[in-house]
Amino acid sequence: MRASEYLIPTLREIPAEAEVVSHRLLLKAGFIRKAASGVYTLLPLAHRVLRKIMRIIREEMDRQGGQEILLPIMQPAELWLRSGRWHVYGPELFRLKDRHGRDFCLGPTHEEIITELVMGDVRSHKQLPLLLYQIQNKYRDERRPRFGLLRGREFIMKDLYSFDRDEAGLEVSYRKMFEAYQRVFSRCGLEFRPVEADSGPIGGSVSHEFMVLAGSGEALVVYCPEDACGYAANVEKAESRAERPKTKEDPLALELLPTPGKRTVEDVCAFLGVGPEQIVKTILYETDRGPCAALVRGDREVNEVKLQNAIGAMHLEMAGPATIERLTGAPVGFTGPVGLEGVRLVVDDEVSFMVNCITGANRGDAHYRNVNPGRDFPLQVVTDLRLVREEDPCPQCGRPLLAARGIEVGQVFKLGTKYSEVMGLTYLDEHGTERPVVMGCYGIGVTRTLAAAVEQNHDEQGIIWPTAIAPFAVVVVPVNVRDEVQSALAEKAYTVLSEAGVEVLLDDRPERPGVKFKDADLVGYPLRVTVGKTAVDGLVELRLRKNGDTRLVGIGELVDTVRGFL
């Protein structure tokens, strides 16, 4: 391929809306162009990268017995109503009507429609296990699309669904996909970490995310060092060992204290001369299961995902001032669990161990001192409710946890019978008994993987593509295209590399050498072959993008040397 014939519209200025490295570089290097908020056109270079990522994915899915299909993007609302997710998904679901007034959606996931498909064609245990996958456009009406390909409204995903006879079969399928995902991301040249994760609206009992470690990642991952136990989890799912009081105290009599205008933990600590770990925060929420109060220590934050799971709520949001006053009789800042009626109490397990703590008194300008859980308020639901932070003790071994930011590029789920039971997907076992099919779901964000690779592989000059997914492995750059010797040797280098099966681009544009060198670094070809003054001696210069190492080689050694570098 010749650069003079290829669409690589590099930019000299970075668009103002580009916030993260991948967004800036993919725009500047001519990989993508914005069509609308969260919607991008993928230009030829990006399409080449995507094809390579998809080839790796297909090879690994096929190796495990996966069969590729293509499901419809537009899905009838009837299926989503049957599964119960039509209303759960909320405003993120693109909804539309056809000319007859029938409701449809643009699929953000495909659990319902693939369950319906298998229902029609799988009847017997002899047809199981079954692995079906697709690589397909997905749609999600993000409230705030941002970061280019990392959080868009239209994106490409691979999703595979497993169908098994029982939980033992699901465990085999889950392990196969888990290991296949590790190979996919390793082959793509990414540094990643599998972590425990919450299942979210897709549901199921067990889930893991595959996180590409990058400072720009939206997700926070906590993990135990690998020389310890290796525990790792998304912060939404992460647990830690509950901290118990360091000194033993006897419970004291409950005492009401005036705290005029002291609404925040910081205000109360300063006024009473105590630390935040002696205070219990009581935070009210409105949910579809009724009002609830989350209780955490004053130096902790509520993990709302854990809270939602603990009470089995579909929706929850923090109560507003009017609701707080109606439920407690007090303004914001003075809520507490003592005497709080008609509200379900969900207590973090650290709070359950506290003695003689301080809480709001459910009356204006007042707090209680010497509150003791179980004595002064009921321990209705006790669970790990806090948001885990760095240096909390690991739940498995007790070592201090580390934290890093990551980009989720894949997630695997044990769905169990969540969809098969509500939608009626069953099979007949060897005794003729009807049983629900046990399902798993396994997704990879293809466009997100492309962007994550850039986030992890770049420098001040531009992208540094891992060789396996680079748009071209080699760029040949003649310094002076008007020099007949240089042009002839560049053509020869291009020809011998192409004939050897190396993906190579010849930059034959009549540009200054500096422009072509900058573009080569910006686009991120793993290897640059420069044809300059040494062309008269039949020599070319090889330069590795990732470290700048260079070497002069003769044209006869070029193919073997390039293969060695790559």
Curated annotation (Swiss-Prot):
GO MF terms on file? aminoacyl-tRNA deacylase activity; ATP binding; catalytic activity, acting on a protein; proline-tRNA ligase activity; transferase activity
Does this UniProt record's set of keywords contain Ligase? yes
Query: What Pfam families does the annotation carry?
Result: HGTP_anticodon, tRNA-synt_2b, tRNA_edit
Gene Ontology cellular component terms for the protein in this record: cytosol
Q: Where is the protein localized?
A: Cytoplasm
Keyword tags: Aminoacyl-tRNA synthetase, ATP-binding, Cytoplasm, Ligase, Nucleotide-binding, Protein biosynthesis
Q: Does the keyword Protein biosynthesis apply?
A: yes
* Known catalytic reactions: tRNA(Pro) + L-proline + ATP = L-prolyl-tRNA(Pro) + AMP + diphosphate
Lineage: superkingdom: Bacteria
EC number(s): the record gives 6.1.1.15
Q: Name one GO biological process term.
A: prolyl-tRNA aminoacylation
The UniProt subunit note reads as follows: Homodimer.
Q: What does this protein do?
A: Catalyzes the attachment of proline to tRNA(Pro) in a two-step reaction: proline is first activated by ATP to form Pro-AMP and then transferred to the acceptor end of tRNA(Pro). As ProRS can inadvertently accommodate and process non-cognate amino acids such as alanine and cysteine, to avoid such errors it has two additional distinct editing activities against alanine. One activity is designated as 'pretransfer' editing and involves the tRNA(Pro)-independent hydrolysis of activated Ala-AMP.
Assigned protein family:
Belongs to the class-II aminoacyl-tRNA synthetase family. ProS type 1 subfamily.
| Domain description | Consists of three domains: the N-terminal catalytic domain, the editing domain and the C-terminal anticodon-binding domain.
The name this protein goes by in its record: Proline--tRNA ligase
Organism, scientific name: Desulforudis audaxviator (strain MP104C)
